[in-house]
Each structure stands twice: as structure tokens, then as C-alpha cells.
Amino acid sequence: MTTTHTPRRLLLPEAPSDDFDFHTHNLMAPPGKALVCLPPEVLLHPETFAARKGVMYSVGLHPWQTDTPLLARQLLDRLPAWLAHPQVVAVGECGLDALRGADLKVQTEYLTEQLAWAEKYGLPVVLHVVRAFDRVLQLRKLLCPHTPWTVHGFRGKPALAQQLLRAGFDLSFGKRYNPEAYALTPPEHRRHETDDAADADARFEAFGK
């Protein structure tokens, strides 16, 4: 994978901090304090969206939305326009989920397309990964990205954390995590998140049907 677009200056904090929420679905998160993942209904209907001043957003196709091909295609086709928005500073959450969504082969195709857009626009990637870390590791080795890939909501064991860190991933920790994995993650590769709001899972599940 090669960069074909001059990366803009990223608005995300270069150095992780305890008071920055790296991944939330709370549309009312305070400006400059969080990376807000926009829901699928907003991505499909941009005319309903008004960006709040100073708020940073991420956009992507969630794995749970991949088992409806028409919906997945509609969301992916809208990504380029969203990625050109000056307040969209990351791609995601996107990724692979072995328990929900389309077949992993199909999910991998969708994810690869999004990773290409992230590389083109010079944007970091927020990854949702469930029982598919081997495939994500293979993708990173194959694509050699120039932008950060962060596994959000990481709950894995220390051995998996070490494997991901050695491969160049960053890790984001939420309310539930393995303390040993957290401790061994260097601060410069460690993010913190809330993954709020309460209805986020219901939204993704509804749009994946």
C-alpha cells in the first residue's frame, strides 16, 4: 500500500493523555477531549449532521454492518466524502469480528478497502477486532501502513498485547481490561476510551440487519 495523498496534519493528540477519550459514541462529547465515532444513520444521511465546533470525528464501516451487502456498499461509497471533512480525523471503527457480521473473507475485503482510504488520506485507524487478530496482523504485515492502527477496547492477555505492539499497533483500553497487558503497554502506544453511549451497540446491530 502506498500513500497517494499528502497527509494533512492530524488533529488527534500526538501524545496519548489520560483525559482524552480515544473512542466514544457520545455525540455530545466536549470539543478537543474525545474522538467521536459517527453512527451509520448519520453516515447515510449527511444532510442531518452538523459538526460541532472543535469536535473530532471518526467514520467507518463497523463489522456488524457487513452482513447486509447493500448497506455495507452504501456506507463505503459515502466514506470518501466524509474523509474530506476537516473534522474527520480517523477511519473507524472498522475491523473484523468472527462472531458477528459477514463471513471473515467478506469482512476482510471491506476492511482492506477502508485501510486503503486511511492510507490515502493519511488518517489513523480505529480497529474493532474479535477473535480475528491473526488476520489483522497479516494485513498489517502485507500493507505496511504509514498511519497508526489502534485496537480499541483491548481486553486481551499480555502475550497478545506484546505481539500486537511488536507488530506496530497501538492499544486503547476501556473500562474492562487485563491489568498486566495495560502495564506492559508503553505510554506512547496506550490510549484510553469510554466507548460510550448506551445505545451504540443497538444502533450497529439494527443497521446490520
Set out the residue ranges of the language-model regions.
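Mid-domain alpha/beta scaffold segments of enzyme catalytic cores
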Residues: 1-209
